[in-house]
């Protein structure tokens, strides 16, 4: 356990629990008897024990992962959670999801800007954190990106990346050569302004030259 980013004992327990339970499951379960779905369900009793002892632990297993893909002028948003026994509920009006919100059963097809909020729920209420996707919309949103760099396709999915690389919304060019990509608008369209967003952190720097053709 590397503790350079931990400022208290609670930070340490947050990092190691329930990961220690997963490590024990892998080490102690006989070969051929490892069952992910049984394990995550059995964690409920273990987490109850941690709470009763006042031990802070991570609830990341209840958080939602997303994938937003530009497709035929729209954006397909896929949501998933590590826990198979919870329901993902969502809203598209900017309101916080609750137990009465629609249940996610299939990818959401987005054709305009707005805010999607989603969270996981079980029989007792909300679990984990709310995922908020602020869907921006412009002439390029939902359009095809032609580029050898697979991550460039994120440029037109309407979701802006955060400072956390784990949001999977980063587009990166680790090359000394110029980065080049084409956004296919599908037809001749007037363009009044082009904006390129950059996260100015220690491993990136703004472009020196930008050519649009």
Task: Give the residues covered by each predicted segment.
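Short beta-strand segments within Ig-like beta-sandwich modules, predominantly Fibronectin type-III
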Residues: 96-104
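Flexible, acidic glycine-rich loops studded with aromatic residues
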Residues: 1-75
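Solvent-exposed segments in extracellular or luminal domains encompassing
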Residues: 106-113
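Disordered, acidic Ser/Thr/Pro-rich linker "stalks" and the adjacent N-terminal cap
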Residues: 131-188, 193, 197-204
